[in-house]
Amino acid sequence: MKRLFSKSLCTSAAGANLKPPPADSAAIAKLILSSPNTTHQDDQFLLSTKTTPWTPNLVNSVLKRLWNHGPKALQFFHFLDNHHREYVHDASSFDLAIDIAARLHLHPTVWSLIHRMRSLRIGPSPKTFAIVAERYASAGKPDKAVKLFLNMHEHGCFQDLASFNTILDVLCKSKRVEKAYELFRALRGRFSVDTVTYNVILNGWCLIKRTPKALEVLKEMVERGINPNLTTYNTMLKGFFRAGQIRHAWEFFLEMKKRDCEIDVVTYTTVVHGFGVAGEIKRARNVFDEMIREGVLPSVATYNAMIQVLCKKDNVENAVVMFEEMVRRGYEPNVTTYNVLIRGLFHAGEFSRGEELMQRMENEGCEPNFQTYNMMIRYYSECSEVEKALGLFEKMGSGDCLPNLDTYNILISGMFVRKRSEDMVVAGKLLLEMVERGFIPRKFTFNRVLNGLLLTGNQAFAKEILRLQSKSGSRLLRKFRL
């Protein structure tokens, strides 16, 4: 485990011989993540990036790569302000930083960034408020999200139909549909609501499986002279399947065809996936074949739905056949396609075939993502293939897909499968590296690693972990440095 506890990518203590990294977001992100939270490393990073030609595109790319490393991303954002004063962040970079801060529940930071945008006369925009509202709603604070929308004008940003539709969508997607419907009824007279508005509300009711309410919205829509579109009908169809109302879904699909609705690939994919989830594989395949007969070309999403259905029903061999059929017909599998099939192969115990498929994936230029790595690491760990799990972890660290919080948690849990002393030491090192990179371990994780070290005779290392826990406190978001 060469990478664990790597204190720096730099070999010179003074940093005099450092060469600036290329203007490449992957290299910069790795440099940031390799740097412990010390003043000395601030200086090292400054020297390393002194001649980097910063642009909004480069900064945004780095922020996106650090998305799962929120504290480090914010350090980087503020670092440019403090040490590269010739560069000024644009609105898109502020929006990304605000989203990261809001996701970490750092609300004072969020509002500090918003006020800064105003002082620079680059915002905030409706998109900025949509970002913050979404984070409020997902954190269980829908009233704050609504208040934010109603008070947008106080920050120089005025409400319009688009922002109204956005706040409704934010509330609905966070399952606060009652609150969204209440706002819709209160303000629909103020805005000239359209098909998009009704589709948002209808989708909200479908998301929480209240299809009778969704049908009421559809009926009201027609009565008010607002024409439903194909998105409306596809949303309703998906809602029936989501609610497990297979018969209603099929009848609705037949009614769509009877009324000469322009059935598209999304419609067919919805039906294929819906039948598959319900375990009706034969009907799913029949609909898939029907769409081809009707001249509606399947999409990659359609094939993904069929492959997922077959894998979930322990028909992984048929899923492989479907995958090869997809490739033979000229479709290019995406990361979801590969992830679904790799998961199916691993679930069936076909580890070597899953590994071969991952290699094929990379050879075809499709980069594995967090889901790919984390899923494979989990399966390896559960089957005591700890060395293979650690090998994938090292591969993540040397590539563009850097380990995230889930990766560390999965791997630390995996170290407890064999209950070996050396595995407990690795778990401790992972925990230390995790904290060093700005992640926030749960108290349970600290205690589990402590107990594991103590029970396997690693008392000295356990004391080091205990000191770290005491120093860190319940949250590790006190003061971060790059």
Curated annotation (Swiss-Prot):
Q: Where in the cell is it found?
A: Mitochondrion
Name-wise, this protein is Pentatricopeptide repeat-containing protein At1g74900, mitochondrial
Organism name: Arabidopsis thaliana (Mouse-ear cress)
Q: Does the keyword Ion transport apply?
A: no
Record's function text: Required for the trans-splicing of intron 1 of the mitochondrial nad1 transcript encoding the ND1 subunit of the mitochondrial membrane respiratory chain NADH dehydrogenase (Complex I).
Arranged from A to Z, the UniProt key words for this protein are:
Mitochondrion, Repeat, Transit peptide
Principal location class: mitochondrion
Which SUPFAM superfamilies has this protein been placed in?
HCP-like
Where on the tree of life does the source sit, at the highest rank?
Eukaryota
**One of the record's GO cellular component terms:** mitochondrion
Instruction: Return the similarity comment.
Output: Belongs to the PPR family. P subfamily.
KW Mitochondrion (keyword) present = yes
Outline the PPR repeats, range by range.
90-124, 125-159, 160-190, 194-228, 229-263, 264-298, 299-333, 334-368, 369-403, 404-441, 442-476
Can you supply a Gene Ontology BP term from the record? RNA splicing
